[in-house]
Amino acid sequence: MTRREFFLSIASAAGARAVPTISQAPLIVPVHLVLDGQAKWRPEQLHYFWSRIWPEAVRDLASCGIRLQSSLRTGEVWRHSGREPEVIGLDSGVINFVISDRIPIEWDNGRALSGVTTRYRGYHLCMVALNHAHCHQIPLLAVNTCVHELLHALLQDIFESRPAGWRGETREFRIDLYATRLWLFHDGAAIRKAARIYVERLQSEVKPRT
């Protein structure tokens, strides 16, 4: 199979055809970017994130009519041995997108994950680890870390615990498939539809800032 046939097979299997969204008003998704003040990262890691990884995610989602409305502040991720990490600087009614150097071991079970998405004490939280985060690299296998984690929220996986075994792997593949379709074909109609429902649920939840 040639590379072209491979890409076309993805589009065919997923019913992929880019759906123009230019005439539609953009769907606003509020994202609260939180820089982990406890992280130990290199300057080039931050530069790579702000110049490559994050802009790529913003462009991809914009291509299907989703606008990330972002704010930025410094927070902290405190890692405590044997118990849940403590994340400071979160807001309600937004996706809290925490930028750190590594995922707490209690959340990644020592697997050196590039990102994680979860509900943390009622807050909606995505976290990326700059030690492992990357742009789009390989369709279906290594997609943009920010896109991958945001899709777990926008497609409403965040409301359910990750299934064990092959069901969990299937959910990850589903996210990578959606990310690949968005990346290669700008096909995000299903994402936008799910995201609209997600934003309504997100903004119905109110908690004070921690």
Residue ranges and their predicted role:
Residues T2, R42, L46, L184-H186:
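Helix N-cap and loop-to-helix transition residues
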Residues M1-A14:
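N-terminal secretory signal peptides and thylakoid transit peptides that target proteins
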Residues R4-E5, A18, A112, L182, ...:
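Positively charged, low-complexity intrinsically disordered regions
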